């Protein structure tokens, strides 16, 4: 049975009594954002709205975007990436679980030197896919042209953000390329691999 979104107590400034709010709203107040699903227009708009609000609230405090996503809509992912570059505060990106397709694209968009993968995280890159499987010839041609433009855009961003040559990124995007956290660091998608907290490990 689904339990819904957990709620936690939060005391507003100047108030004596705490109110119960969902855990994500509480974390947003600490500038912690989460992408824990497939990227679509709805989640993209939510993340962009939160980033714009936090940017206006305080431009001096960094934001932290935790990513566990299989990817999703290309334009929605690009819009999140662009918003990350637009806001004044640095956006740390932290990969936990999987950052695939547009998830990895958003991951690499974090502030350089502030992109992190947890030790057992996985990253995957590939080229954008077409949404037309059955359509008129003209529609398919137009779609193919648009996909090529998007692929070129994504490739250039990966080149800029990873430091890899254009030919390497272009070749790797021809197929699904999975990486461990350490491999993603060597590739340039992340800058650091988090260290396990051994104090929490019990014998």
From Swiss-Prot:
Cleaves peptides in various proteins in a process that requires ATP hydrolysis. Has a chymotrypsin-like activity. Plays a major role in the degradation of misfolded proteins. One of its GO terms (cellular component) is chloroplast stroma. It comes from the Eukaryota. This is ATP-dependent Clp protease proteolytic subunit. Component of the chloroplastic Clp protease core complex. The active site is at residues 101, 126. It catalyses: Hydrolysis of proteins to small peptides in the presence of ATP and magnesium. alpha-casein is the usual test substrate. In the absence of ATP, only oligopeptides shorter than five residues are hydrolyzed (such as succinyl-Leu-Tyr-|-NHMec, and Leu-Tyr-Leu-|-Tyr-Trp, in which cleavage of the -Tyr-|-Leu- and -Tyr-|-Trp bonds also occurs). Keywords: Chloroplast, Hydrolase, Plastid, Protease, Serine protease. GO terms for biological process: proteolysis. Its main location: plastid. The lineage of its organism: Eukaryota, Viridiplantae, Streptophyta, Embryophyta, Marchantiophyta. It comes from Marchantia polymorpha (Common liverwort). Its EC number is 3.4.21.92. Pfam families: CLP_protease. It is found in: Plastid, Chloroplast stroma. One of its GO terms (molecular function) is serine-type endopeptidase activity. PROSITE patterns: CLP_PROTEASE_HIS (PS00382), CLP_PROTEASE_SER (PS00381). Belongs to the peptidase S14 family. CDD domains: S14_ClpP_2. SUPFAM superfamilies: ClpP/crotonase (SSF52096). It is an enzyme of class 3 (hydrolase).
């Amino acid at each position: 049975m689904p339990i819904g979104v957990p709620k936690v107590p939060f005391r507003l400034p100047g108030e004596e009594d705490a109110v119960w709010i969902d855990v994500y709203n509480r974390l947003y107040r600490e500038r912690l954002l989460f992408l824990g699903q497939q990227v679509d227009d709805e989640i993209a708009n939510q993340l962009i709205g939160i980033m714009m609000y936090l940017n206006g609230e305080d431009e001096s405090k960094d934001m932290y975007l935790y990513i566990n996503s299989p990817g999703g809509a290309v334009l929605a992912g690009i819009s999140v990436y662009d918003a990350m570059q637009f806001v004044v505060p640095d956006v740390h990106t932290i990969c936990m679980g999987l950052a695939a397709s547009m998830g990895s694209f958003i991951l690499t968009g974090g502030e350089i030197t502030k992109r992190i993968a947890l030790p057992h995280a996985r990253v995957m890159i590939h080229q954008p896919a077409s949404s037309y499987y059955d359509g008129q010839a003209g529609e398919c041609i137009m779609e193919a042209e648009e996909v090529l433009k998007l692929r070129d855009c994504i490739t250039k961003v990966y080149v800029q953000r990873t430091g890899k040559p254009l030919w390497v990124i272009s070749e790797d995007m021809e197929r699904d390329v999975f990486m461990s956290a350490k491999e993603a660091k060597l590739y340039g998608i992340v800058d650091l691999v988090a260290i396990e907290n051994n104090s929490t490990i019990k014998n």
